Amino acid sequence: MKYLYLLLCTLLGFDTMAQTGQSIEFTQIRQELQKKWPDNRTVNLVFHGHSVPSGYANTPNVKTLQAYPHQVLEAVKEIYPYAVVNSITTSIGGENAEQGAKRFKQEVLPHRPDILFIDYALNDRSIGLERALKAWEKMIKEAQKQNIPIILLTPTPDLTEDILDDKSPLEQHSRQIRRLAHDYKTGLIDCYATFKEKRKNGEDLNIYMSQSNHPNEKGHRVVTKLILNYFFEEAQWNEYCQKQTMTIMKKVADWQLMNFENQVRKGSQWANSHAYWAWTNATMYIGMAEWAKMSDDPKYWDFLLTMGEKNKWQTGPSIYFADDICIIQPYAILFSKYKEPYMIQNSVETLDTLIANPKHNSLSYYSEG
């Protein structure tokens, strides 16, 4: 199971190792998140910025639960089950850093952030580097007066700009934010560099975007993974990866259960292509059996038993056609669990016949298409 989930982590794009924030402030937050009642307290994660942390997707649609502030909350709660955590967004769509700085004392600091995230660069292009710098510095200084740990974010992409252009406005704002993080010793989430690297590696950034300047759920997931480096140690990354992989596997298995009979009834242009014994289903049964071993829900074994009963534990019509006898392996798996001879009786007879009567002539066949 260990190797299976690590493989799936790789295939599904989860990081199993990550560098964590090194500041003692972030270490203290991780320690706070591990405390149990009655020694714990509420931890406030405050996200200040524009439309991206607000959850704007295809404007005017707002998908709050797909945005990185909510994704971070879900992930943190997955690993810190005893923590009381609030994800608070003080962001406003269309706002730039100057506007955000004006309401900072009245609308952000009263939330008493344990960690403050600032994400304004996309909209700061309208006010330029100098004005943006003053606004960011104002917010940073006001937060640091109250000893609030800060994480600055470089922008997510805008597809109307060439992200590979080192002189683009967003690249210039990203450099300025990196300097701010260095000068004020804040945390840094370098979204821009991450997406830029993806583009350099040949990825189409459209798959991460709802519209030209708003990421979709997958794009927000990229930002979330960067943020989680401040919350997870290596062992916690492994645990989170495993839980996320298990969640996805369960969704896939449950979809199969929900839609299986419709697929069998629908069939296709090829006769028997979706019969209970068909190889297409047999391979799915094998995967379902592996999932059933990992899950604590008996419904997956019940599904496989029902399949065997509906199929009367028979193979397909031709013993010399591998597709028609592929179903024997799921039967064997069920027999190994339940030890009921009737589950493999027909399979044993089929294999005995095949061994006793080997074919020496060609098994080629013609199929249209």
Regions inferred by a protein language model and the residue ranges of each:
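Low-complexity, Ser/Thr/Pro/Gly-enriched N-terminal "stalk/linker" regions
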Residues: E239-T306, P341-E349, T353-L354
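Sec-dependent signal peptide cleavage junction
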Residues: T16-T27, N238-T247
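Alpha-helical cap/lid subdomain in secreted, periplasmic
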Residues: I24, Q28, Q34, P38-D39, ...
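Short catalytic helix/loop segments, enriched in acidic residues and glycine
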Residues: V62-K77, G308-E309
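Bacterial Sec-dependent N-terminal signal peptides
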Residues: M1-G21
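Short glycine-rich His-centered loop
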Residues: E32-K63
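Well-ordered alpha-helical segments within folded domains of soluble proteins
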Residues: W277-A292, Y320-S336, G369
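Aromatic- and glycine-enriched pocket-lining scaffold segments that form the walls
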Residues: N361-G369
